[in-house]
Amino acid sequence: MQPSDRMRALPRRARVMIMVTVALIALLVIGPRLVVGYTDWLWFGEVGYRRVWGTVLVTRLILFTAVTLLVGAVIFAAVVWAYRSRPLFAASGANTAKDPVERYREVVSRRPRSFTVGIALLLALPFGLHAQASWETVQLFLHGGAFGTVDAEFGYDIGFYVFDLPFYRLILAWLFIAVFLALLIGLGTHYLFGGIRLAPSKDHVIEVSRPARVQLAVFAGTFIALKAASYWLDRYSLLWSGRKEPTFTGAGYTDINAVLPARLIMVAIAVLCAVAFFAAIAVRDLRIPAMATALLVLSAILVGGIYPALIEQFSVRPNAADRESPYIERNIAATRQAYGIGPDRVDYLDYPGVGTRSPRDIPADVTTIANARLLDPTVLSRTFTQQQQLKNFYGFPEHLNIDRYTIDGQLTDYIVAARELSPNSLSGNQTQWINRHTVYTHGNGFIAAPANRVNAAVRDVAGQSASSDSGYPIYAVSDIASQVGGDQVIPVEQPRIYFGEVIAQADPDYAIVGGPEGVPPREYDTDTAQYTYTGTGGVPVGSWVNRLAFAARYGERNILFSGAIGSESKIIFNRDPAARVEHVAPWLTTDSNPYPAVVGGRIVWIVDGYTTAAHYPYSQVGSLAEPVVNDTGRTLAREEVSYVRNSVKATVDAYDGTVTLYQVDENDPVLGAWMKVFPGTVQPPTAIPTELRAHFRYPEDLFRLQRDLLAKYHVDDPREFFTTNAFWSVPSDPTADTGGEQPPYYVLVGDAGTAAPSFRLTSAMVGFNREFLSAYLSAHSDPENYGRIDILRLPTDTQTQGPRQTQNSMISDTRVASERTLLERSNRIYYANLLTLPIADGGILYVEPVFTERLTSTPNSSTFPQLARVLVSYREPGTGGVRIGYAPTLAEALDQVFGTGTGAVATAPGGDATTPPPTGGQPPAPPPPGAPPAPPPATSDQLTAAVLELNNALANLREAQHTGDFTTYGAALDRLQQAIDTYLAAGGTPH
């Protein structure tokens, strides 16, 4: 019986069932992608970046189609070639009774076209899907330009390595895949149709027909030719070789003098091998390509592996410093350029580490001390929550932020936070879908607290009578209530927050808002009022098509049937500020710490964006991200880069979600390429509002990376670099229970030239595997000097204590140790940010706030940290000893270290959010045992006059600080001292 007789046609009903099943499977696979694609299209339209979505989609589709067609066409050609050149006996079906593949041959022969196309598509589709993810590489190749800098080995512009070479490697990889699959499929097809047979004779184990030999030789020769091209491109990849890591990245002596020549030799051998395969077509002798292949493999082992290893072992290692010095010099220059830590951005200044003058005599030091930050944003989240939460469904992030504001002409740094909606804190009936997504939709207000003072000093911190209303932030609240009352310190026109970090922690994070006029508001605003969203943000869900799409996206039928959704309703989603920026600018890497700011009366999130590249020749490899440990305890791999620029500052409006990208680096070639890919998406620097620019901070992730690199790359001499003797280390965090590196700190310090307050990101550095202080880094955030990094270098034989030594000295002090013993009985102690402050014309002042929190066994108790003490450490000039100050206030601690008078320039506790109190505004400290009796109090008129003169003297001193005139400043300081003496003589309270 013929095969066609054995095969019966399927009934029509069965065919329909098969088609329906296939359609349902396709719908299940493709349907969710279509839903997400459609809702994303709506979202990109809402934020005004639909062109980005379209460009990415079109690029992906073109890549998918091109690679699928390329791989599929080559495979198709291989199958057709093998099928059409099959032996006649296979075509006629003769003498196949004992052929083991006869059954399969018959099946394929019935529908050769279907099988050919099917196999080609089946194998090509996965590679097409994989290729579409490389859209960034293709777009950078099409739009990339020159860096204006050439590499030290080949003399090519850096743009070749960043923009062009990755694309060439991508093309080569696709060709490799296509040819290799074609070779395998051609081999299989020839075997199926008899072009290749297991021979029964003793002379030949395998019989290969001439057409099969020709086809296999062509594809094998092509594959080897591609390998030759790969060897050629591998020469350029040596410029980021990891052979010498961790010493340095890039081609070393062995790479340049052994591996590079070996690559050229391998190119020549591979070309000869490819020619040998092509020659086998005419010569009809497979021994030639076989010997060529053996030569290629043997050469790869000897020339590519053993020879470089011998050079490394017997020539380089015995003379490593001499051999590697020229290449280390290349690495130093390239790394500095790639990470923006070269002499064009970094200023070095030798610094003795020992003070030579009194801080009171230096205007910049007076500014630094007056603005010494006592509030720690990593400690105060629960304090903010307990004192400013208002409702259980509001919340603050675990780590607050630091920014600065000019209030009444005075620049002050503030601990800032947005009072966001916390959906995960909803409880009971609040978690019902209708409440969670249509009633509790937004946060309320911007909270700020001056970072250099608290409301009052805590005196008897260890006693049971410790004040419950002391040691807490002084809040400046800009919310709905303060807006109505008209008493906002930082004016906010729209205090409602629909987009934020805490809001986005919910999954899903969407809210359905808005409604037609005349319909009663539904959203919770205050206890006495509801609200209807009127912003431009959100995707309309009034139509049934959109409601169905979002119901499918979130798997929520209530979106379809809820009566709370009307014709004017909108759905707000993608509410995380950093995620919104990453969506509209997928080519950016965002900083891990967005922060809120009030700009133009609106609350906006400021997000730092980085452009990166992975293959900058000779540049050291680094990572912007902190190490991440998963649930199993394994450290996850981090994205490695070798070029970084903080070229974009983005803002996200907290009310309507508007995303705006601003260019802040006009010399970044990577950003220039992306601006060509997505024209009009990034605003020029001239479009940045002055008020917004005043809130730009030097980004923390970039500073951490640069700090790690500067620990090594401050060294100029390659031989000294090789020995590592002059390296620095990032100090361990002495205040953290789990160890780790000390984080950088934002501080407001006095500018050495003008004495005006300057907002900077700072970090101490210690010697390599030592604990003594070696350097002090500070990055400017002020608009006029933004991005410059100052480095104070201490002598290599310095005995100035580093952060951990200082911490140990302070907590070992007898006063501290004795009180700590009492405190730990009923309190938890938090040692907050240990600030390193250069003062006294060469000295280092350490300031560390100490917070306490009452221990309690009561469930859900409302205890939270309060500032209890201030620790101060300073190296004494001359003797080199360390002076420790420990007191309820910074002023008292400074007076213990520097003597009476220095504390007068510190900011006292109390006052309101805009105005600190006069220097005498602190409660009196209890007299020490055995002290002489206090003098009789002065008259009220004398004390009033003394306070008035003291305030006038302080005002005069602040004015003198801003003039930069040292003579005027000295006179103002003398007047202040006289006023202090008069005030004390009149019975005023000392610090």
Swiss-Prot record:
Per UniProt, the ranges with Low complexity bias are 903-914
Transmembrane segments annotated in the record for this chain: 16-36, 61-81, 115-135, 170-190, 214-234, 263-283, 291-311
As for subcellular location, the record says: Cell membrane
Q: Where is the signal peptide?
A: none
The record's keywords, sorted A to Z, are: Cell membrane, Membrane, Plasmid, Transmembrane, Transmembrane helix
Q: Tell me which GO cellular component terms the UniProt record holds.
A: extracellular region; plasma membrane
Membrane topology of this protein:
Multi-pass membrane protein
Instruction: Give start-end positions of Pro residues composition bias.
Output: 915-938
Ranges for the region named Disordered are 902-940
Entries under Pfam families matching the protein: UPF0182
The record's comment on protein family reads:
Belongs to the UPF0182 family.
PANTHER family on file: UPF0182 PROTEIN SLL1060
**NCBIfam families listed in its UniProt record:** PRK00068.1, PRK12438.1
Question: What protein does this entry describe?
Answer: UPF0182 protein RHA1_ro08670
Source organism (scientific name) = Rhodococcus jostii (strain RHA1)
